[in-house]
């Protein structure tokens, strides 16, 4: 079972990725994880990636694809894998296809930008414990304070509205074209494409995923 998750930041991909990993026993593969593992293992690809990063340069699509190909050959990916945040661009998707990385399911989590902004901007965290609240959807018992310690809650820098809006613009420019790409791939019989309504509660989305994936 080889799966790609698509959706804007805040669309709920991370939560559902966890559900898929636990239910189906397949590993999640992210670009960051692949790079860190390759650098740590000091493989040839890892050394190339480290040289680029040390020089302050972006790791090339070719190198990322090569890392992905190397990673999915490993034993723990024998039953499949879950790609989150990759491919991010059309050239990456094309390159994946060219090197023979097949995908069984592409799952898109659709959520309007206005709700994503609401979801992210309203997040509050208790930094020492990692507990997360939301001013509207999961408020603390006492406004602005952690339920357990009573300490003040804070907003992450990445959760500021202007930052979220910038990330959404970037998503629509770079990643949204993948939606058309994979819909066409599904029409051609190369994968199966499903759009899930990410505005629903977590358990409803998980139930639909279980019905799709079997």
From Swiss-Prot:
GO CC terms of this entry? cytoplasm
Localization annotation: Cytoplasm
Taken from the record, one Pfam family name reads: ADK_lid
List residues binding AMP: 31, 36, 57-59, 85-88, 92, 156, 167
Kindly state which reaction or reactions the protein catalyses. Answer: AMP + ATP = 2 ADP
Known partners and oligomeric status: Monomer.
Function per UniProt: Catalyzes the reversible transfer of the terminal phosphate group between ATP and AMP. Plays an important role in cellular energy homeostasis and in adenine nucleotide metabolism.
What is the name of this protein? Adenylate kinase
Protein source organism: Sodalis glossinidius (strain morsitans)
């Amino acid at each position: 079972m080889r799966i790609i998750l698509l959706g804007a930041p805040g669309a709920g991909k991370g939560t559902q990725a966890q559900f898929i990993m636990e239910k189906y026993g397949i590993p999640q593969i992210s670009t960051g994880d692949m790079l860190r593992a390759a650098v740590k293992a000091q493989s040839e690809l890892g050394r190339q990636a480290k040289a680029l990063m040390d020089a302050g340069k972006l790791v090339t699509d070719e190198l990322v694809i090569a890392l992905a190909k190397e990673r999915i050959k490993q034993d723990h990916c024998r039953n499949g894998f879950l790609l989150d945040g990759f491919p991010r661009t059309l050239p990456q998707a094309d390159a994946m296809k060219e090197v023979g990385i097949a995908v069984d399911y592409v799952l898109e989590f659709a959520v309007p930008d206005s709700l994503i902004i609401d979801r992210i901007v309203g997040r509050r965290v208790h930094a020492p414990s990692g507990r997360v609240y939301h001013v509207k959807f999961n408020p603390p018992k006492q406004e602005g304070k952690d339920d357990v310690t009573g300490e003040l809650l804070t907003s992450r820098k990445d959760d500021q509205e202007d930052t979220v809006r910038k990330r959404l613009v970037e998503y629509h420019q770079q990643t949204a074209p993948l939606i058309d790409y994979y819909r066409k791939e599904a029409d051609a019989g190369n994968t199966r494409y499903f759009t899930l309504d990410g505005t629903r509660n977590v358990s409803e989305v998980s139930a639909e995923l279980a019905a799709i994936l079997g």
